[in-house]
Amino acid sequence: MEGLESDLEGMRQYFRSGKTKDVAWRQSQLKGLLSFIKETERDMCKALKEDLGKHHVEAYRDEVGILTKSINFALHGLKEWMSSKKAKLPRVALLSSAELVPEPLGFVLIISSWNFPFGLSLEPMIGAIAAGNTMVLKPSELAPASASLLANVLPTYLDNSAVKVIQGGPAVGERLLQQKWDKIFFTGSARVGRIIMSAAVKHLTPVALELGGKCPAVVDSVSSSWDTKVTVNRILVSKFGACAGQACIAIDYILVEKRFASILVELMKVMIKKMFGENPRETNTVARIVNEQHFLRLKNLLSDSAVQNSIVYGGSMDEKNLFVEPTILVDPPLDAAIMTEEIFGPLLPIITLDKVEDSIAFINSKPKPLAIYAFTNNEKFRRRMLSETSSGSLVFNDAVIQYAADALPFGGIGESGIGKYHGKFSFDTFSHYKAVTRRSFLTDFWFRFPPWNDYKLLLLEATYNYDYLGMLLVILGLKRRR
């Protein structure tokens, strides 16, 4: 970290040179990212296995493949994203034009999380590069193999005058936060998000905070056994099959009517074994918990006797191998930690309700989540979920898939996050849209200049009310002020 300030100043100066604004530079850096992913795919999967115990197919599905898609999407849309957009002016603005011109913010900081160490590092970087910024990436120290690959190999594919990867723990993060940035993009916990936001206040630095929360899944009385089976499969893969539930958009808990709860639970028991095997610890289909601290946190969530009594499936833990079995609970106490804190692991509480409609009030009694998942064929209930709840995203009849949609913004609301990214939304979050107006010297709004009189006031009134007929009548002397 010696010479950090001088290195960062050099990157600021490089941005001021204007080189990163060129479309060819942006394309070359995006292609460099793509080459990194293609040529180090095996190393990426190996690092994800070492850090989190992810199966290589899961690693490809959730990180390698997602990033490949995102970069290709950015390369395809880049020139259009960079182009200015015309803005419509009132008709009275003769011989005038206006446009929105996107320009890079400047020098940005990206601080990523450990659960998807490549995806959550490079996805925002795609947007920052596409927008023409210089940047520093600080990957999470809790995924050391992945962070090492990013720090030691990624720079060989990119312009090191514009992109720098800095490894380290909280002390390094704190030192970086003391610097002046044009934007800070952070993915992680709400606790650290508050620290980021507090540090940003010093320089009035804008922030994007991708946080999390307790994402609910509402299961309605679906119309057929097929629909029920599809629902269960999608719930299980979204909860236990995505980094063992260590994902900000993973299902945190399920809401279901009492009369359907037993049907749901029994089918889940069967499908867990089919999907993850009789012994998931041996089949390598469920990722490991990232470290001992998080393992003990999950263990403590089950320590309460009332919570233990609500376990209907699973519950076993292997501290040596940081493995937690997929676990289902039915109606744990609502004031227990497992129902008040984000779980971030393979523990799935099911809360039973008298009516599925009660789920709306239940969800609204808690902070706005990053995502809500509703499995239902009832159009009226869908409309109510859409109009009466608030969340970063709302998905009907599936879960987590919204993360892969480049056409949709990804981000939270309230305590689940600030800002959005993915696709063009990533470009936008690292851009400033400059408002540009052009006027001719040939015409003017002469009635905007003193000295004042009632005639000018009439013209101003007509102008601000878009009353072009009234303006004509004033000019012709056919309309006077009352």
Where do the PLM segments sit?
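Rossmann-like NAD(P) dinucleotide-binding subdomain of oxidoreductase/dehydrogenase enzymes
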Residues: 88-230, 353
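Residues at or immediately preceding the N-termini of alpha-helices
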Residues: 4, 23, 41, 225-229, ...
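Conserved residues at the C-terminal ends of beta-strands
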Residues: 111, 169, 187, 238, ...
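Residue-level signal for inorganic ion chemistry
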Residues: 26, 71, 132, 163, ...
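ALDH superfamily catalytic-core signature
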Residues: 191-333, 396, 468-481
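Structural signal for hydrophobic packing residues in well-ordered secondary-structure cores
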Residues: 34-37, 41, 52, 75-82, ...
